Amino acid sequence: MSKLFWDAQVPWLRLNGSGVRQFLQGQTSADLKALQSGDLLQTCWLTATGRLRAVLELRFDAEGADVVVLAGEASAVHAGFDQVIFPADRVRLQPLGQLRRLQWLEPMAAAMWCIPDAALPEPWASGEAATATALEQWRLQSGFPPGPGELNGETNPLELGLVAQVSTEKGCYLGQETMAKLIGQAGVK
């Protein structure tokens, strides 16, 4: 049997400018300061009260960052970012697009992004795209990504097992006070 992988078209936002890293550092829950150019990192976009709005995957480069929406409403992320970008931020938000995301159905498997119509590179070409049933079984076992009913405006990242996507060390970000309180109490509602 071939190795199974998740093959998905995902919403993609592009941010350009010299202030992109600082902007995303203040808007998302993970610490982005040490993220190297080209590396992928998952993070959460929260409300001011720490409710989960979206799970994002980021990749920085010399000109800015690519943001993939793994769970949540991409149009809400785009509009939310657009509302809080000021000229002093040195950030330009591009229109929404699509990327193709590949990930083996294994614990801690790294993901790869490519253009939507690209031929599968090796070793993906030797694997097998997971069926909807296999993907849902993996999602339920791994707890990732959150399902549509789990992003209901009432849950926080800790309740959905996304503690690795939340930094307790980085300082201020949207929803940070609630996350610090919950992590400090070592509990969820």
Q: Where is each model-derived feature located?
A:
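Basic, glycine/lysine-rich polyanion-binding surfaces/domains
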Residues: 1-189
